[in-house]
C-alpha cells in the first residue's frame, strides 16, 4: 500500500501474532483458540487489525501519522504490523495486544511470535501440527524464520527474492512479495506445493509493478 513518493505513508504488512495460551498441552490448543475467539466476540468492540490498516492508508497524512494510529488505536485481537515509509529512517515493527503496544525501530524482522518472549504466549504454528508440536517447537518455528531474514546480506536491486530460502520458504508459502516505497516498486511471485514435495516451487513468473503502471 502506498500514497505517494514524497512524504507518503509507505507500505505495510501484517503478521499473525502469537497465540494466547491458558494451557501448555498441545492437545488443548483448540481449547485456547476457541477461548480466545469467544473472548474477542463477547468483549471486544474494537476494530479488527486488518481493517485498521486499511483505515490508516485511507486517512493517514504521512508515515508518522500512520505509525501513531497503529500504535494507539485499540484492536480486536493481537497483531504484528511492519510499517515502512518513503525515507531511510521511516521503518518500524509494532507488536500489538488489544490495548498495548511495543514498537521497535531495529531488529526489523517479524514472524508469528513476539521478539521478546512473554509468559502465556506461544508462536503460531501450521494447522496440521496444532495437536502435536510442543511449546518449544512453536517458538523455534518463528525464531528460525526471523534468523533466516536477519542473516540475508543480499540487495533489493540485485538479488530479487534471494532471501526466500528455508526456513522463510516453508510448506505454507503461496506468495512472496517485495516492496520499496521510496522507488514505488512492488514485486510478487506465486508458489504451489506439489504432491510429494516438502517445499513449494514458483509457479508464476515474477511480476513487477511500479506506481505509474498501477495508476494507469
PLM regions and their residue ranges:
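C-terminal, well-structured catalytic/ligand-binding subdomain of enzymes
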Residues: 1-216
Amino acid at each position: 500500500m502506498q500514497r505517494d513518493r514524497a512524504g507518503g505513508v509507505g507500505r505495510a504488512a501484517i503478521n499473525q501474532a502469537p497465540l494466547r495460551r491458558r494451557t501448555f498441552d498441545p492437545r488443548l490448543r483448540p481449547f485456547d483458540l476457541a477461548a480466545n475467539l469467544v473472548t474477542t466476540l463477547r468483549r471486544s468492540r474494537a476494530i479488527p487489525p486488518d481493517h485498521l490498516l486499511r483505515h490508516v492508508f485511507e486517512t493517514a497524512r504521512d508515515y508518522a501519522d500512520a505509525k501513531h494510529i497503529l500504535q494507539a488505536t485499540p484492536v480486536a485481537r493481537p497483531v504484528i504490523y511492519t510499517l515502512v515509509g518513503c525515507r531511510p529512517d521511516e521503518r518500524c515493527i509494532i507488536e500489538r495486544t488489544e490495548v498495548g503496544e511495543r514498537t521497535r525501530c531495529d531488529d526489523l524482522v517479524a514472524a508469528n511470535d513476539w521478539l521478546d518472549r512473554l509468559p502465556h504466549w506461544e508462536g503460531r504454528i501450521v494447522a496440521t501440527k496444532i495437536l502435536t508440536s510442543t511449546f518449544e517447537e512453536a517458538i523455534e518455528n518463528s525464531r528460525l524464520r526471523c534468523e533466516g531474514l536477519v542473516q540475508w546480506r543480499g540487495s533489493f536491486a540485485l538479488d530479487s527474492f534471494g532471501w526466500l530460502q528455508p526456513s522463510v520458504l516453508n510448506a505454507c508459502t503461496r506468495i512472496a512479495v517485495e516492496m520499496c516505497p521510496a522507488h514505488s516498486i512492488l514485486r510478487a511471485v506465486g508458489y504451489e506445493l506439489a504432491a510429494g514435495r516438502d517445499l513449494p516451487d514458483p509457479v508464476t513468473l515474477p511480476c513487477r509493478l511500479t506506481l505509474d503502471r498501477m495508476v494507469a
